[in-house]
Regions:
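Residue-level hotspots at or immediately adjacent to binding/recognition sites across diverse folds
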Residues: 1-338
Length: 338
């Protein structure tokens, strides 16, 4: 199905913050209102309207896109997984407020439980599908997973807790988890802080002896059996357990937002570009100009990779790229109207 300018005109008022693959024909995005974002201060985040947008490649021209505006939510993350034979899309904000929808429901949910035992001990920084289950990770060693509607289970277990009341003058950077991935439910990795890496083997967490104290941002448990971890400036490590090697010295302006495994390769992206690991060499991907606008975030599932930036999105089928939309020109027109 051809997505027309009329279909995607909705993105004139919104820009993308995150994306997820529901299946090879359904792509979903967390978005935020552009005009409200320009006016809001840092402490007014919840006054900016957020939203969940779905694009359906198998739909008719009149029924290929949906929008659900969401009020009173903070920084919004989005993921998708299957439960009880139907798939769902789940949006969580940094404070643990939840919106979810599937073919059976479409509603706001109870806030994710907060407390020393988790799942939430502080703010959320990521939601990710691992082996068909949605996991969340965040500050103060927050880790948990979704077990159904209004059902979040803690995986904080033996992860240490930072006591802000007793540690005045410190921010507990080493407890600020940024990402999670895994080969299975019983083989998970979380990363964050300065060289802070933990491994879960099914019973408890074990801290990994990581060979660097740089700030860590992303992790990918890849199809080649290795774990890839990136940090500040795009520095990239490869390993597993307590054996690690640096495969890229970085030197980029921004850290990677996401690392994924797709089409037999490791892919990394930031707002400044897309890179692919060729052997042990990280090389920039030469993208057509209309696709390059979509760099920023990655999601994989059902054999495809979705890439989304503030003003565009594209997907890769394992062989070639397909543009979903590019709204950069619309944004220029909109700014002129302001």
């Amino acid at each position: 199905m051809k997505i027309t300018d009329k279909n995607i005109a909705i993105f004139k008022k919104w820009y993308i913050k995150d994306c997820t693959v529901r299946n090879k024909d359904f792509f979903h995005f967390s978005v935020r209102n552009i005009k409200e974002s320009r006016k809001a201060s840092v402490i007014d985040e919840n006054t900016v309207t957020k939203g969940e947008v779905g694009i359906y490649l198998d739909g008719s021209p009149d029924d290929c896109i949906s929008l659900q505006p969401l009020k009173n939510m903070g920084q919004l993350y989005i993921g998708s997984a299957s439960y009880n034979s139907y798939d769902e899309v789940v949006c969580v904000d940094d404070e643990g407020y939840v919106y979810s929808r599937s073919c059976k429901y479409d509603s706001r949910e109870k806030k994710i439980p907060f407390g020393i035992d988790g799942p939430l001990r502080n703010i959320i920084t990521k939601i990710k599908n691992i082996s068909g289950r949605l996991y969340i990770v965040g500050y103060n060693n927050s880790v948990g997973y979704r077990d159904g509607v209004n059902d979040w289970q803690s995986l904080c277990l033996n992860l240490p807790v930072f006591d802000y009341s007793k540690e005045k003058g410190r921010f507990g950077d080493e407890f600020k988890l940024r990402d999670i991935d895994g080969f299975s439910y019983d083989d998970l990795y979380v990363v964050g802080g300065k060289g802070y890496v933990w491994h879960f083997s099914g019973a408890e967490w074990e801290q990994i002896n990581f060979p660097s104290n740089i700030y860590l941002e992303t992790v990918c448990c890849a199809g080649d059996g290795y774990v890839y971890i990136s940090g500040q400036s795009g520095i990239l490590f490869k390993g597993r357990g307590n054996k690690w090697e640096k495969v890229s010295a970085g030197g980029y302006s921004l850290p990677f937002e996401d690392i994924v495994w797709h089409a037999g390769k490791v892919w990394c992206t930031s707002d400044y570009g897309l890179w692919c690991l060729d052997g042990d060499t990280l090389i920039p991907v030469d993208l057509p100009s209309e696709i390059a606008v979509a760099v920023g975030h990655l999601s994989v599932g059902d054999g495809v990779m979705l890439m989304a930036g503030m003003y565009g999105a594209a997907w890769h089928d394992g062989q070639e790229w397909h543009l979903l939309f590019n709204s950069v020109e619309w944004q220029s027109d909109d700014e002129a109207e302001d």
